[in-house]
Every structure is written in structure tokens, then in C-alpha cells.
Amino acid sequence: MAQRIFTLILLLCSTSAFAGLFDAPGRSQFVPADRAFVFDFQQNQHDLTLSWQVKEGYYLYRKQISITPTKADIAAVQLPTGVWHEDEFYGKSEIYRKRLNVPVTVNQAAAGATLTVTYQGCADAGFCYPPETKTVPLSEVAAAIDATPTPAVTQTSETSKPAAQLPFSALWALLIGIGIAFTPCVLPMYPLISGIVLGGRQRLSTGRALLLAFIYVQGMALTYTALGLVVAAAGLQFQAALQHPYVLIGLAIVFTLLALSMFGLFTLQLPSSLQTRLTLMSNRQQGGSPGGVFVMGAIAGLICSPCTTAPLSAILLYIAQSGNMWLGGGTLYLYALGMGLPLMLVTVFGNRLLPKSGPWMAHVKTAFGFVILALPVFLLERIIGEAWGLRLWSLLGVAFFGWAFITSLQARRAWMRIVQIILLAAALISVRPLQDWAFGSPSAQAPAHLNFTAISTVDELNQALAQAKGKPVMLDFYADWCVACKEFEKYTFSDPRVQQALGDTVLLQANVTANNAQDVALLKHLQVLGLPTILFFNTQGQEQPQSRVTGFMDAATFSAHLHDRQP
């Protein structure tokens, strides 16, 4: 008897241990969205907390989270900072892993009030889920006396344009500041400023001279840092509006005008009366003393010359776009430090370190005009799309390298011939996208992609299966938000081996980007958890579950899968 019981226990254990060996090959390795992103909420009067428990190997997109109240008023939602994730098609995106808590302040909620929460995530293995929508019932909350009304709809995804996505970082501000120091409006002033800082004294120790110059630069940096903090704080209040297409176009026009001022078409500077007052205030300070030197530096930060106004304005607009106060203050501090480094060198070592003035300083100013022109191209690229953005970058590159090449022709040194060849080659490379646009791209000769027949409902699928006339059918699910779907199109479906293997197969595709009721019904009918998912049907119109594909496959793997699948 005991032997039989022992045998039965072994049988049960072996069945449990090896059950996975007999699972259907087509079974998805991915869990449903509700298990990948476990959503929960908790309300305590005015305080509501939305929480997600994110499964290991999965992540949520920050920009895909939106919160919309109904019969309720909530404060603006501030999503926490995520971690950066980058892919080929969507670039950098902020994501959340492991756990996410979002606090929401409910100013007022009537009877039957709800909160509609939409979110979307993917798996690291290249599998993305359709947008999930949850309805959160709210308890009645009376409006506080000092509650400030907020807009009825809070779209947190609009605020997810982080400063790091802008084309230059705060470190670039240091290099720009150093470059501005060599423009014709700034460089000739350094010997004069150095003399004022030292109070006209020629015999000071090196340490004392360096200290006074450093204090002057810190005074100037304080003014710029405060300006950066103010602009960043203002930009934070209007950050969502700063992402509107009309606002982006307006900013692009402003940046273009700033660049034109660097080209000498017109002059930007403070009114002369205000500059005179600031100069008089600076002259009242005593040179050679730390306090007086610091005040002179702080006032000097307010006096913008024609060469510094445009770059400073561009950096301020960049900071306003970011809405990041730490970045705003730090960027302007580094910019002022970059402008002050040459002054410190002149104060300590004298004028012998300065290069001689000449036409080259005007060329430095013009070069900064091209740098500023890169900003409107970056902003417009969000509106006009990647293709037109590439053409604008191409046009800017041709203009810059062409100008640099023509300018270099004035040089007489032999080694400049090598520089001229490099500049000419860079201009020819930059013109390539414009050439492809005007005369057609050689890539147009690339193998054609698969010719899919679009379906969107269960009835259309059944009709297509009935019309297949004894041929096998492949159904591909596609969405614009699915990165791996785009990889399938670019790398897998364009491969000749794959196209040959699918030569006798009827190709269907369901675009579920909208994730509307029809899309949801089709996904539910076929038990599709997420994308990419590819289904195969035999000649009788029956799905072959063991052949189902979930997740990305390269051309070689997918081609082998096509040959191995059952007819």
C-alpha cells in the first residue's frame, strides 16, 4: 500500500515538473496587461494615489499616461521623473519600471465622479500592449475654500518633452560662452575690463589678481544664474503650451531672427539709455576690492552687447522649453563661466595670451548664427516629420559648410588646403538628402515590402478567410506605437527569403493603432494580448496556434519559422 502511495506521489510530481514540456509551441511567453502592469488606487478625501506594480522585464511609457476627470476638479498632475529608454524608431523616451506612484489632488468631486486613467507599456523582449484604460470611482469631496479651479482635462503626456531631448546640454553652454568671448564685441574689451577689475594697479600678486577676476566672474554668473532660474520657473508654468505646434513655429521664427542678427542683418541690444545707467552704476564701484568687483560683475551681466544678446536669448528660450530650474540656473552659470575664463587668463597673464583682433572674430560671430539656426530646425522637426526635418538639416549643413569653405579660400597657409577639402567634402555629403528628394533616392530600388490586405473587424477576417480559396493565410497585427512592428516591416518583411516563403500565402494586416471598439473586439476574438502578433491559418481557415508569433523575429529566424510551420 505504501509503495502505491509513493508511486502516486512521484507520478504527480513528475507531471507537475514536466508539464511545461508539453505546452503548445504557440503559447505566448508574455503575460496579460493586467498582470504586467498591476493597477491600483487609494483615496483619502482630497488625496488620491494611483499606483502601478510593473512586472520585471516590462515598463510603462511616461508620455502615454493620461488622467481625465469627469464631474470632478483635480490639480495639475506632476508625473515623477522616469529612466531613459531609447529605440531606433521613437528615440529617447522616459519609462517606469518596478513601481510607479502618482499622487493626485482632488479639489472637488461630485456624486458619480470618476477619473479615466490611460496608460501603455511594453516588454523588454519587444512586445507592446495596446493602451489600457481604467475608470477610477471617486468619493464625493467638497471644494476647499481656497481651492483654485483647474482645467477639466489633465493631459500629463503633454509635459513629457524633457530638456534632455533638446539638441544641446548644459555643458554646451560653457563652450558657447568661451566662443562668445572671441567675438568682435567682447574680445577687445577684456584688457579694459581687466584693468578696471584690478583698480588700475599694475603690481598685484598672481593669487590676488586671480581672486579678483574670479570674484568678478562669479558676480556676472550670479546675474545669469538668477535670470535662468526665473525663466525656467516661468517656462515650467507654461510647459504644455510650449509644446503646441503654433508656439513651436513662433519659437522657430524667433530663433531664426536671432540667428539673422548674428549674421549682421540687424542689431539686438539693450536700449542705449539703460546701458548708460548700468555703466554709470558699475563705474561707481571701487576696483581692486572684492565687494566692488563682485557688484561690477553682477551689473556687467545685465549689459548685453550686440554679439551676446542673440546667443543669450537663444539659451533663455531653450531653458523656457525645458522648464527645469536646475538646468536653467546651471546652464546660465556655465555660460557666464565660459565668457569669464578668458578674462581670468588676461587678468593673470596679461594681453600676450589674447589673439590679435581681425576679421576672424566676425567669422566666429557668423558661425554662432549657424549654431542658433539649428534650434528652429530641431523644433520644426516635431511638426513637419522626420523626412522634412532631414531635408532642413541637410540645407543647414550645406549652408554652413559652404560658407566655411568660401571663407577659408581667403587663407594663404598651405595647411588650410586640407581644411578646404574637408569642408567641401562635408558640404557634398550634406547635400545628399536634398539630392535624393529632388532626383529620387537609390533606396527606391530596394525590394518591395509585402502587399497586405487590410482588415479591421471579425467579419472582414471571416470573409477574407472564406475568399482565400484553399490558400494558407497570414494575419499580421500592426500599430504605430509598436516598435517591433516597425522592425518587422523594415528588416523582416523586406527580406527576399521571407517574401519567397510567403509567395503562396494570403497576407492580411490589421492596423490597431486607434485601439477603438472594433480593434479591441478583434484582439479579444483572437486572444491577442499585444503586439507584434502574427497568426497563421491553414487552407481550411483554421488558426494554427503552434505557429503563432509573438515578439520580434529577424529575417532568418522568421524565414525558418515559415518553413517549419505545419501546412
Swiss-Prot record:
Residues 435-567 form the Thioredoxin domain. Pfam families: DsbD_N, DsbD_TM, Thioredoxin_7. One of its GO terms (cellular component) is plasma membrane. It is an enzyme of class 1 (oxidoreductase). GO terms for molecular function: electron transfer activity; protein-disulfide reductase [NAD(P)H] activity; protein-disulfide reductase activity. It comes from the Bacteria. Its EC number is 1.8.1.8. It is a multi-pass membrane protein. Disulfide bonds join 122-128, 185-307, 482-485. InterPro entries: Cyt_c_assmbl_TM_dom (IPR003834), DsbD_gamma (IPR035671), DsbDN (IPR028250), DsbDN_sf (IPR036929), Thiol_diS_interchange_DbsD (IPR022910), Thioredoxin-like_sf (IPR036249), Thioredoxin_CS (IPR017937), Thioredoxin_domain (IPR013766). It is found in: Cell inner membrane. The keyword 4Fe-4S does not apply. Residues 1-19 form the signal peptide. It catalyses: [protein]-dithiol + NAD(+) = [protein]-disulfide + NADH + H(+); [protein]-dithiol + NADP(+) = [protein]-disulfide + NADPH + H(+). The chain crosses the membrane at residues 170-192, 212-234, 246-268, 297-319, 326-348, 358-380, 387-409. Required to facilitate the formation of correct disulfide bonds in some periplasmic proteins and for the assembly of the periplasmic c-type cytochromes. Acts by transferring electrons from cytoplasmic thioredoxin to the periplasm. This transfer involves a cascade of disulfide bond formation and reduction steps. Belongs to the thioredoxin family. DsbD subfamily. HAMAP family: DbsD. This is Thiol:disulfide interchange protein DsbD. It comes from Salmonella typhimurium (strain LT2 / SGSC1412 / ATCC 700720). The gene is dsbD.
